Amino acid sequence: MSKKIGILTSGGDAPGMNSAISFLAKSALSLGFEPYLIFDGYSGIIARKILPAKNFPYNGISSFGGTAIGSSRFPEFKKEEVQNKAVEILSEIGISSLVVVGGDGTYNGGYKLHLKGIKVIALPGTIDNDIQFTDYTIGFDTALNTIVETIDKLRDTANSHRRCFVVEVMGRHCQDLALYSAIATGSEILITNTNILTPEEVSQRVLEQFAKGKPSVIVTITENILPNLKEFAAKIEELTKISTRSLEVGHTQRGGRPSAFDRILAAKMAMKAMELINQDKSGLAISYLDGKIQTFDIAKVVSKPVRKTNDLVLEINKINQN
């Protein structure tokens, strides 16, 4: 077994990725491996942006947001000839094992390399929390805290002006960021891909909330549902005659120093990944499920790209709407 291990981050960046990188490198060294950092995701393999970890200050990056080795979306990697080129380049360098950190696209890319003989272990690094068989992904907790802080501040000004705010958060096709932030902030109305409401329905609920004596109403929405957030807010104002503003939280959700939870989660997953590589395992994804670090076949994980939200969380959210 080759002692050279590649480490890359791919897809959208997520707070905690740097902690994963740091602990992957340190764990690899402690087991006698030679870690290599691959810059800018899968495209970095093709571009030969590969550097021995010993030549990079990986020790001091755990507290920083983003990913110090860069990331990218590389749709060309779906082509078999590009995958074959990646295997050829990794083999030339002597890298026989690879740890990839990212979302479902990253998992799919890693699985293709696994099928071609590269030993691959995958870590869930995405703020969307949309990976199957893990309760939390690296970056989700930090992004959630960013959203909660933003909505809490909106609530302050909304209370002062008897106003309604419509807030759109990230999550792609997964409702977890919207759902968990709605629970944490007491958002009165939640719109997700499993709970779509018309402007008329939202307006009726807004009026009901103000009729109860509430000084403000927060509407939290998952991205990719509304064609135009500002127009939606304007329609609510038109129907209710209540001052309504909109806010797209945007890419601030991806930034910021990772929470302690994300740093620790990344560290635990990284150490488990290196344990598996030391056992000559491949084609496995690391997860945090039911309070334990576990492993699943990557093939099983990517076959179900959208997670189902815990039923208990959904029930708690129903209570929050009253």
From Swiss-Prot:
Protein name: ATP-dependent 6-phosphofructokinase
Similarity remark: Belongs to the phosphofructokinase type A (PFKA) family. ATP-dependent PFK group I subfamily. Prokaryotic clade 'B1' sub-subfamily.
Binding site for Mg(2+): 104
Signal peptide per UniProt: none
EC category name: transferase
The keyword Nucleotide-binding belongs to this UniProt entry's keyword annotation: yes
Recorded GO CC terms: 6-phosphofructokinase complex
Record-listed substrate binding positions: 126-128, 163, 170-172, 223, 245, 251-254
GO BP: any one term: canonical glycolysis
InterPro entries: ATP_PFK, ATP_PFK_prok-type, PFKA_ATP_prok, Phosphofructokinase_CS, Phosphofructokinase_dom, PKF_sf
Natural source organism: Mesomycoplasma hyopneumoniae (strain 232) (Mycoplasma hyopneumoniae)
Keyword tags: Allosteric enzyme, ATP-binding, Cytoplasm, Glycolysis, Kinase, Magnesium, Metal-binding, Nucleotide-binding, Transferase
Residues the record marks as active site: 128
Record entry for activity regulation: Allosterically activated by ADP and other diphosphonucleosides, and allosterically inhibited by phosphoenolpyruvate.
Catalysed reactions, as listed in the record: beta-D-fructose 6-phosphate + ATP = beta-D-fructose 1,6-bisphosphate + ADP + H(+)
Positions with a binding annotation for ATP: 12, 73-74, 103-106
Xref: Pfam families: PFK
Chief subcellular location: cytoplasm
UniProt keyword annotation of Lyase present: no
EC nos: 2.7.1.11
